[in-house]
C-alpha cells in the first residue's frame, strides 16, 4: 500500500536527524533520489515493526469477528481470520493479536493478575486465530495505524528516531552516526514504553500452562 502523505513529517524529521534534505509528497509518489527511494522501500515495514513491538495505546483496536467456514485439522474447533482492514468494516488491519475473549478469565489478586481455572487456550497461526470459542470471537489487537493525527506525539518522535537509525549508514555512509542514532533510539524506546504503560491498569500477562500450574 502507498505511504500516506500525512506521514511525511515523520519521514522528514528522520532525514533531518541524519543531515539530509527533506523530501516532498511528490517524491513519495515518484521517488527521484536516494532518500525518497529509501523511504518508499522501507518506511512502512519499519513503522509496522515498531507498532508490533509494544501494545501502544493509540494503536489498540477491538473487534467482534465471525468464524471461517473451514476448521482446524486438530486441537481446536474453530478458526477466525485476522481483521484485515475491510472485514469487519471500519476496523484497522491487525498486525498482532493481543487478547481474545476466551483469554479473559483472570482475577486481580494480591500479586497482580492471577489466571483462573477453566479458561481455554488459543493460538495464532498464519493470520488465523484458532480457538474453541464459537462465533462471535471478541479480539483485542494492535492495528496498522497510518494516520499521522492518530499516532501519539511520543510514538511519532520514536518512529522518526528509528528511521534515522535505519537510514543513517545507507544515506551517509557513517558508521559512527549509525551507532549514535541507535543509542538514541534505544533510550527513547525504553522511555516511550514506560510512559505508554502507565495509562490505565496493567494488562494481565499471557496465559501459559506454567502459570496454571503455579497458581492452582
Q: Can you name each region flagged by the protein language model?
A:
Residues 1-216:
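Glycine-enriched, solvent-exposed interface loops adjoining structured elements
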Amino acid at each position: 500500500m502507498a505511504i500516506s502523505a500525512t506521514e511525511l513529517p515523520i519521514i522528514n524529521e528522520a532525514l533531518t536527524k541524519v543531515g539530509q534534505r527533506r523530501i516532498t509528497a511528490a517524491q513519495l509518489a515518484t521517488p527521484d533520489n536516494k532518500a525518497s527511494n529509501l523511504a518508499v522501500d522501507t518506511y512502512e515495514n519499519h513503522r509496522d515493526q515498531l507498532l508490533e513491538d509494544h501494545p501502544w495505546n493509540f494503536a489498540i483496536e477491538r473487534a467482534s469477528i465471525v468464524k471461517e467456514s473451514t476448521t482446524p485439522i486438530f486441537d481446536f474447533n474453530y478458526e477466525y481470520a485476522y481483521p484485515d482492514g475491510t472485514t469487519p468494516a471500519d476496523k484497522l488491519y491487525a498486525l498482532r493479536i493481543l487478547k481474545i475473549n476466551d483469554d479473559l478469565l483472570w482475577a486481580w489478586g494480591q500479586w497482580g493478575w492471577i489466571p483462573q481455572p477453566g479458561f481455554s487456550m488459543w493460538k495464532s497461526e498464519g493470520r488465523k486465530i484458532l480457538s474453541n470459542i464459537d462465533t462471535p470471537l471478541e479480539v483485542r489487537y494492535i492495528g496498522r495505524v497510518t494516520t499521522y493525527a492518530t499516532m501519539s506525539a511520543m510514538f511519532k518522535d520514536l518512529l522518526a528516531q528509528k528511521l534515522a537509525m535505519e537510514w543513517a549508514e545507507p544515506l551517509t555512509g557513517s558508521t559512527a552516526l549509525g551507532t549514535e542514532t541507535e543509542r538514541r533510539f534505544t533510550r527513547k524506546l525504553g522511555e516511550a514504553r514506560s510512559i505508554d504503560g502507565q495509562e490505565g491498569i496493567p494488562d494481565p500477562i499471557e496465559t501459559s500452562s506454567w502459570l496454571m500450574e503455579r497458581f492452582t
